[in-house]
């Protein structure tokens, strides 16, 4: 379209850096500018994440080749941010799909107290495969040039949640990864046999984890639970029932 500017910028902490334009072929966050671009949303609260220095941030990851062709490679919301490293989940998924024992896979970020997020992957093995997830992880390690991108864990699944268009439903996998991280934190805090309920609620761009404990949970245990989940740096609330 005439008068359209398209550029790919670097990311830092999941946010666009319009002062750092990516080199040809380098993957970054795609942004567009032009007279046909909307000046903003009716709800101004959405503008902060969608506009930067006059650019409309598409939310897509992409690259521009030396001839000016634009290629989309993924979604920015799927980027895994591990201790300041921006990890494209596609890098992990491609390494896994090259293995003959993998039929389908998806990589997501799992909350982590130290790194903020760690890369993990859910894997559906090929029919008849008996490989363990530990052996599978060891066999794909050499595929990664960036050590931070090596998944910390692989979770085996029999099937994936899918969208109506046949795509893997990654938000559901991120919730499962977060739930697993929370439960691992609480295993040493909450008495064995305690009934725990975990759910998620979406509000705008933010997803909140809701944790419900029994009404008779001791105050000191509640305090430790809040401290443990806070360390994962995810929005949450705790209630009793």
Language-model features: locations:
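A structural signal for short hydrophobic beta-strand segments in well-ordered beta-sheet cores
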Residues: 6, 60-64, 107
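Active-site lining segments that contact anionic ligands and/or coordinate catalytic metals
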Residues: 3, 27, 67, 102, ...
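Conserved beta-loop-beta connector loops within the AMP-binding
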Residues: 1-31, 66-67, 129-133
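Hydrophobic face of alpha-helices
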Residues: 27, 31, 73, 89, ...
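Short acidic amphipathic segments
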Residues: 96-105
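Conserved C-terminal "lid"/linker of ANL adenylate-forming enzymes
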Residues: 80, 106-112, 120-124, 137-241
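Short loop/turn microsegments at loop-to-beta-strand junctions
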Residues: 3-4, 53, 58-59, 103, ...
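Conserved ATP-binding/catalytic segment of the ANL
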Residues: 20-90, 97-98, 114-115, 147, ...
């Amino acid at each position: 379209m005439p008068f359209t500017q398209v550029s790919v910028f670097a990311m830092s902490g999941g946010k666009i850096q319009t002062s750092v334009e990516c080199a040809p072929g380098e993957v970054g966050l795609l942004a567009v500018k032009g007279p046909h671009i909307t000046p903003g949303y009716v709800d101004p609260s959405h503008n902060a994440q969608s506009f930067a220095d006059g650019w409309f941030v598409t939310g897509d990851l992409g690259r521009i080749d030396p001839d000016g062709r634009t290629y989309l490679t993924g979604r920015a919301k799927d980027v895994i941010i591990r201790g300041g490293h921006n990890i494209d989940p596609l890098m992990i998924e491609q390494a896994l799909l090259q293995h003959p024992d993998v039929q389908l896979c998806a990589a997501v970020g799992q909350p982590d107290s130290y790194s903020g997020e760690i890369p993990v992957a859910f894997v559906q093995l090929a029919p008849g495969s008996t490989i363990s997830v530990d052996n599978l992880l060891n066999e794909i390690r050499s595929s990664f040039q960036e050590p931070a991108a090596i998944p910390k864990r692989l979770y085996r699944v029999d099937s994936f949640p899918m969208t109506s268009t046949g795509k893997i439903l990654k938000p559901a996998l991120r919730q499962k990864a977060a739930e697993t991280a929370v439960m691992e934190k609480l295993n040493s805090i909450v008495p064995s046999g305690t009934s725990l309920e975990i759910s998620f609620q979406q509000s705008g761009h933010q997803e909140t984890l809701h944790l419900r404990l029994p009404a008779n949970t001791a105050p000191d245990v509640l305090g430790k639970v809040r401290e443990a989940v806070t360390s994962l740096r995810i929005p949450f609330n705790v209630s009793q029932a």
